[in-house]
Amino acid sequence: MNKYQNAAHLSGRFVSEFGMEAYPHLETTKRMIQPVEQQHPGSAMMDFRNKAGDHERRLSTYVAENLPLRSFDLATFTHLAQTVQSETMRYAYKAWRRMWGETGRRKCGGALVWQLNDCWPTISWAVVDYYLVKKPAFYAIARALRSLDVGIARSDPDWTNGHNDPTLADPADFEVWISSSRLESVEARLAVSFISIATGRHVRDPIIRTVEARPNATTECVDGQRAAEIDKDDLGWGKDDPYVIHAVLEVNGKTEATDTAWPQPLKYLDFSSRGVSVEYSSCKTEVRVSAKLPVKGFVFSETQGLELSDNGFDIMPGEVHVVHIGGSGVAKAGLSWTYVGAERTEVAASRPKL
């Protein structure tokens, strides 16, 4: 098995099939798995609903290698599996779209994800389940395929070779680029920030540039830079202060795209006390999500008929992520949500706070 972080090295002129398995949302699982006693990872009925060969070994390996597995209950494992699938889509689509390059230097011309949706209620590679409920990976693909997108590639240590020291600092070599499918050049403002996961502070000065995104091409913006090592003597057991690299692309003062590169693996990071806030508008047609500290993989648990404008996203301090809500499945008592490292699945208050 290959790490999904290595997607950029697994490309071709056309990627005809690739994917990653994930559980559907909880509502779908509970509809297809009966009796209730079978609703847990590894049960006979759960295995029956997964037709992939060696699925136990493959899915569990990807989760255990990358994410903090503090509980094996259905809700927690569902979120972690969905996060793995979503991260795979982010790494793959952004890397391969970058390889579209420019005229005369095209390296990758397209990719087909396996698969779009299911033909029966199951656990599979689909990014939309049998009841047309979208998994977080669907939104990761949508974000990566925006007409104007920004991407970050960050160096990753090999933490599975048995001879690594997880307390050492990540040197964080990184690159930033813009992918455009528009037919005209676009002048944009690019801001790259370096944010401490532990404190939310900016650990070095941001990179701010005005760039011209070329039409139907990739525009390389930051190439081969290395972020400085940040001392962490007063913050805990490690020898550095882990931080995210966060890029924001604006056109005429409006945010067109963002991307965030985290230190790998995510399971070594402390996600406690994120200070997440979820607030409904007065008419409950939108919800605003914010956090005091960087958050990974914020996911609303979706149900049949519910329509969200976005899901499965990261949150940075100082930003407000607005999600529009619609459809026949709008939850009247509040949407259930969680994120990587959350102590428990939390429920947003239904009373408006705006």
Enumerate the predicted regions with their spans.
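C-terminal accessory/binding modules appended to enzymatic or scaffolding proteins
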Residues: 272-326, 340-342
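Intrinsically disordered, low-complexity Pro/Gly/Ser/Thr-rich segments with frequent PxxP/GP/PP motifs
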Residues: 190-240, 305-331
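Terminal connector regions
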Residues: 177-178, 220-274, 324-354
